[in-house]
């Protein structure tokens, strides 16, 4: 009986819907873009590249998914969009994270 209860609790705890996963990924993405915008303004493009590289080397779960999307899109293109003052939600939509 304890095993069944444990399995049910475990299943419920990890039963995240695709919509909820998408919301999490989108929120992570917009937060990342805002962080990168601040970093780009204060430290420059090389620091943005270093930050993304460092983050992605340690990433797992949703962060790893986001890293894959960012790297597939291209860091230089991402930096250009940030420099062009494109909204974080629009950037995340372009990289298919929102």
Curated annotation (Swiss-Prot):
Disulfide bonds join 26-98, 29-92, 56-67. It is found in: Cytoplasmic granule. The keyword Metal-binding does not apply. It comes from the Eukaryota. GO terms for biological process: defense response to bacterium. The record marks 96 as: Essential for homodimerization. Coiled coil: none annotated. InterPro entries: SapB_2 (IPR008138), Saposin-like (IPR011001), SaposinB_dom (IPR008139). Pfam families: SapB_2 (PF03489). Optimum pH is 5.2. SMART domains: SapB. Residues 22-98 form the Saposin B-type domain. SUPFAM superfamilies: Saposin. Keywords: Antibiotic, Antimicrobial, Disulfide bond, Signal. Residues 1-21 form the signal peptide. Gene3D superfamilies: Saposin-like (1.10.225.10). Forms pores in the cell membrane of host cells. Has antibacterial activity against M.luteus, no activity against E.coli. Implicated in the cytolytic activity of the parasite. Monomer (at pH below 4 and pH above 6). Homodimer (at pH 4-6). Hexamer; formed during insertion in the membrane. This is Pore-forming peptide amoebapore A.
